[in-house]
Amino acid sequence: MPGGLAVSTVFATAGFADLPGVFSDWITSLDMAPMLILICILLGYAVLGMFMDAIGMLLLTLPVVYPAVMALNGGEAVSAAEATFGMSGPMCAIWFGILVVKMAEFCLITPPIGLNCFVVAGVRPDISVQDVFKGVTPFFIADGVTIGLLVAFPGIVLFLPRLVG
């Protein structure tokens, strides 16, 4: 119970201190290309995913990172013509959400935590964890390429949402 109270206090304090707003202001004031900042954020997720559970990582970071990415794009109500990433605010939210979920999936097979690999090794006692990590290497590479494509060509992600309207 004291641990839960401590965590609640930290989150309440961070919310009252406007941590997402401060982080967004800091990110947008950097003298870097917005796409480079996005890549740094995704690399940060990859590093965090090596040591944290994916859901915990998302719950702790998204309230701070999402407003920063939206600010980089030009805001929630920006039109596609004025946006940094070339898409309107709602489309950018969909794109970033899919990128983050894909990063969470990527982190589930990333050593040393790689939760999915440990689950497979636990279900199949005849296979060692090292063999499982060797076996997921092609998937690790494919996920990296997929994330790269989703960053480079956001139209892949937004094809169906644009058809709907």
Please provide the spans of the model-predicted regions:
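Alpha-helical transmembrane segments of multi-pass membrane transport proteins
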Residues: 1-165
